[in-house]
Amino acid sequence: MSQKIRIKLKSYDHMLVDKSAEKIVKTVKSTGAVVTGPIPLPTHKKLFTVLRSPHVNKKAREQFEVMSYKRLIDIYSSSSKTIDALMKLELPSGVEVEIKV
């Protein structure tokens, strides 16, 4: 096949993203394909500010943040064996996987 496969991983837990990326790289390398990555993409931080009191005290506020972590993996010179191995791979439920061929 020898086409480029790009895998993007996204999660709110950086440990899950790193373990998933490591698992994918290990699986792909065992099939003989060339892998670049995992490349860490910028972390997005979303900040929410809410009032502590439901009625008064506008000055009393609380802030919450949600961080999303991303990794990028490129696979070159893949074969049907590589794609079969990726299809059978089980990843944690907290990781969003986007694959582009």
UniProtKB/Swiss-Prot annotation:
Any one GO CC term of the record: ribonucleoprotein complex
The keyword Ribosomal protein is assigned to this record: yes
GO molecular function, one term: tRNA binding
Keywords: Ribonucleoprotein, Ribosomal protein
Signal sequence range: none
Single GO BP term: translation
Cysteine disulfide partners in this protein: none
UniProt family annotation: Belongs to the universal ribosomal protein uS10 family.
Complexes and interactors: Part of the 30S ribosomal subunit.
Entry function: Involved in the binding of tRNA to the ribosomes.
Protein's name according to its UniProt entry: Small ribosomal subunit protein uS10
GN (gene name): rpsJ
